[in-house]
């Protein structure tokens, strides 16, 4: 949809998944670092639930793009012209992400699925998004082209990271890098909506102003800095939470050891006095 809601919807989806990943990957990393098996019991179930939710998000996106009042309603061609190709492009983007979610579920439900195929399909979905957006804004005003082209850095960067993860699976650095780009993508979709379609009746941006292009470029850097801050805060939050949870257990173990040592000392002292 060529309006504010059409950019806020995917932006919200990417933000929700990005915030979840910013908590999930540090949690998985700390448990793997401690070589703890506590998480393995529930981790696969979490992955399946996440994949199902991402698939649901994609299906909702397709339905919204197709069946809004001015949408194509599944009509691609009518009489002598194409019908709402922009909505069809957005639907195609969502379709690939739905396939990615389904592949993620199959990876954890069926043991015969090759490991790494889920990452490969997700990389293809991200590449497809970038490919569509590259040709999405041709022959548009300069500011419109520029603000959408900045989005390509996050999309193709995420696709590249996912492609590397096919080989280097469970690499925390790659996972956090991908998460930061997804957060950036989510906030930037919202920014595009505010710039091109001001929701509160504000003044429209001059689409041909070079100063506006310079500001938008700088604003993109600010968005990424904000994404990194969110990621750092989530990482620290998970670390502090796990440290606090483990502390009572450590105290309990230390207390038991101390009681045992005190009991052994008293027993040795009593046996020594009996001999005297």
Swiss-Prot record:
It is a multi-pass membrane protein. The keyword Transmembrane helix applies. Keywords: Endosome, Golgi apparatus, Immunity, Innate immunity, Lysosome, Membrane, Phosphoprotein, Transmembrane, Transmembrane helix. Disulfide bonds: none annotated. One of its GO terms (cellular component) is Golgi apparatus. The chain crosses the membrane at residues 7-27, 48-68, 95-115, 147-167, 181-201, 213-233. The modification Phosphoserine is found at residues 271, 273. GO terms for biological process: innate immune response. It is found in: Endosome membrane; Lysosome membrane; Golgi apparatus, trans-Golgi network membrane. Its main location: membrane. It comes from the Eukaryota. Belongs to the TMEM45 family. Plays a role in innate immunity. This is Transmembrane protein 45B.
């Amino acid at each position: 949809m060529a309006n504010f809601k059409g950019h806020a919807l995917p932006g919200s989806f990417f933000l929700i998944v990005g915030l979840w990943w910013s908590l999930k990957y540090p949690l998985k990393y700390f448990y793997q670092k401690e070589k703890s098996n506590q998480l393995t019991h529930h981790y696969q179930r979490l992955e399946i639930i996440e994949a199902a939710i991402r698939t649901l998000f994609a299906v909702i996106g397709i339905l919204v793009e197709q069946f809004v009042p001015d949408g194509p309603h599944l009509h691609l061609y009518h009489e002598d012209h194409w019908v709402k190709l922009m909505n069809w492009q957005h639907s195609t983007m969502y379709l690939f992400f739905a396939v990615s979610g389904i592949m993620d579920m199959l990876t954890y439900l069926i043991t015969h699925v090759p490991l790494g195929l889920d990452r490969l399909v997700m990389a293809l979905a991200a590449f497809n998004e970038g490919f569509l957006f590259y040709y999405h804004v041709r022959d548009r005003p300069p500011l419109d082209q520029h603000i959408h082209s900045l989005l390509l850095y996050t999309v193709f960067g995420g696709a590249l990271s996912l492609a590397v993860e096919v080989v280097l699976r469970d690499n925390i650095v790659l996972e956090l890098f991908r998460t930061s780009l997804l957060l950036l993508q989510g906030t930037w979709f919202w920014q595009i909506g505010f710039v091109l379609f001001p929701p509160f009746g504000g003044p429209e941006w001059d689409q041909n102003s070079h100063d506006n292009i310079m500001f938008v470029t700088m604003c993109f850097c600010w968005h990424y800095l904000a994404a990194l801050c969110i990621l750092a805060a989530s990482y620290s939050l998970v670390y502090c939470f796990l440290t606090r949870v483990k502390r009572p257990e450590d105290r309990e173990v230390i207390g038991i050891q101390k009681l045992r040592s005190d009991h052994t000392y008293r027993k040795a002292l009593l046996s020594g006095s009996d001999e005297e």
